Amino acid sequence: MYKKRKLAILIALLTGTAAAHGQTDLNSIEARLAALEKRLQDAETRASTAESRAASAEQKVQQLTQQQQQTQATTQQVARRTTQLEEKAERPGGFEFHGYARSGVIMNDSAASTKSGAYMTPAGETGGAIGRLGNQADTYVEMNLEHKQTLDNGATTRFKVMVADGQTTYNDWTASSSDLNVRQAFVELGNLPTFEGPFKGSTLWAGKRFDRDNFDIHWIDSDVVFLAGTGGGIYDVKWNDSLRSNFSLYGRNFGDIADSSNSVQNYIVSMNNFAGPVQMMVSGMRAKDNDDRQDANGNLVKGDAANTGVHALLGLHNESFYGLRDGTSKTALLYGHGLGAEVKGIGSDGALRPGANTWRFASYGTTPLSDRWFIAPAVLAQSSKDRYVDGDSYQWATLNLRLIQEVTQNFALAWEGSYQYMDLQPEGYNDRHAVNGSFYKLTFAPTFKVGSIGDFFSRPEIRFYTSWMDWSKKLDNYANDDALGSNGFKSGGEWSFGMQMETWF
C-alpha cells in the first residue's frame, strides 16, 4: 500500500514538471522567433541601406568615370594645343634685323687728308682690288629688315629689304651728299607643298636683290662674282642628293637712270649648278640697241658697244684649307665675252665691245697656324683684252696675306701685306695712258674684339692702324683724275694712320 502511494506521487510530480517545461519551451521558442524576425528585419534594413550605398557609390563611380573621361579629353586637347604651340614656336619666323657697317678716320704723316681705298690703283678701274686693312676712310652702312614665317602646311615665306648708304665726309650731317638707296626688296616662297620631284623643297623668288650665292674675298673688298638686279627665279632644284640648280632672270639698266629716254636694259639669264663642292655657273645676256644708246644730251654713248654676252664660272668650295689642313678655302675661274666680259659684276658694264674677252682667277683660304696665330692668303688675277677699244689690254694680279696674332681673348695684332702688279694698255680710251708696274702696302693694326679672336669672320672689331704704301713711278702717269700721282700723293712712299670700326650681324 505504501509502495503504491509513493509511485502515484512520483508520476504526478513528473507529469507536472513536463507540463511546466513544455510551457517554458514554447515561450522560449516564441521569443527566439521574435528575436530572429527582428534580426531578419535588421538585416533587410542593413541590406537595403547597403544597396542604397552601393547604388550611390556606383553613381559616384559613373560620375567620376565621366569626369575622368572629360578630363582625359581636355588633357588630350591641351596636349594637342601645346604640341601645336610648341611646333609653332619652333618654326623660324618673325622679324629679323641684320646689318653691316664700317666707319673710320685716316690721315697721312703730316696729319692731313690722304688717298685710300681698295680700288685706288689704276688696276682698280677694271676690278683690281688691294688689301683693305688700314686703307679705308669711308662710312658705309647696310641695314636689312626681314620677315619670315612658316605656315601650317610647311610652306615658308621671306621678305627682305636692304637700305644702304655710303659717305666719304667725316661730318655728322651728310644729307646733301648721301647715297642712301634701297639695294634690295624681294620675296621668297619656299617648301611649297604642291611642288614635287626635283622641285620639292625649292624656293621661288621675285624682286630686287643680290643673288644668294654670290661670294667675295673680304680682305680685299672684292666680290669674286656679283649677280644682282631686279627679276625672279628659283633656288635649289634638286636633281639628286648631290646635284642642285638655280635658275634666274635679272634685269639691269645702262647709263643714266635719271634719263627718262634711256630704255636700254640688259637681261641676264643664269643657270647656277652645284655638285657637292663644285660650282658651275653659266649666264647669257642681251641688251638690245646698246650700241645706239644716247646720253642725256642726245649724244651717242658708244657706237661699238656689245648687245650680247656670255659668262661662265667654275668654282670649288672647300670645307678645309685646300684639302691640306683645317680651315676654309674657295677658288674660282671665270670667263666672259662681249657684255659678259665684266666677269665680277655680271652685266653691269655697258661700254664693253662685242669682241671683249676676260679671264679671272680668284682664291682665298683661312687656317690656324697655331693656338695664337692665324693666316688668310688670297690671290686675285685678271686678263682682259679688246675690252673698250680694239687692241687694248688690262692685265693685273693681286697677292694679299693677312695674319692675326692673338694676345688675349679680346686683343690681337693684325698684319697685312698686299702686292699688285699691273700692265695696262688702254690705247687712249677715256684719256688713260699705258703703264706697268707694282704697288705695295703693309699694315699693322692692333685690334680689339669681344671674342673669337682667331675667327676671321667674327665682328665687331675696333682697329688702330698704321700703313705704308709705295708704287712704281710710272703708275703716276696713268690718268689725271685717279689717286696715284695726284697732288701730294706720288710714288716714293706714303704713310697713313687711323682707326676704324667694322661690324656685321
From Swiss-Prot:
Start-end of Low complexity biased regions: 46-82
Segment forming the signal sequence: 1-22
Domain of life: Bacteria
GO biological process terms, semicolon-separated: monoatomic ion transport; polysaccharide transport
Basic and acidic residues biased stretches: 83-93
Topology relative to the membrane: Multi-pass membrane protein
Gene3D superfamilies for this protein: 1.20.5.340, Porin, LamB type
GO cellular-component term (any): pore complex
SUPFAM superfamilies noted in UniProt: Porins, Tropomyosin
GO molecular function terms noted in the UniProt entry: carbohydrate transmembrane transporter activity; porin activity
Keyword field contains Metal-binding: no
Major site of localization recorded for this protein: membrane
Key words of the record: Cell outer membrane, Ion transport, Membrane, Porin, Signal, Sugar transport, Transmembrane, Transmembrane beta strand, Transport
Disordered: annotated segments: 44-94
Subunit structure, as described in the record: Homotrimer.
Free-text comment about domains: The C-terminus helps to anchor the porin to the outer membrane.
Function: Porin for sucrose uptake.
Similarity comment: family membership: Belongs to the porin LamB (TC 1.B.3) family.
Entry protein name: Sucrose porin
Organism: Klebsiella pneumoniae
Underlying gene: scrY
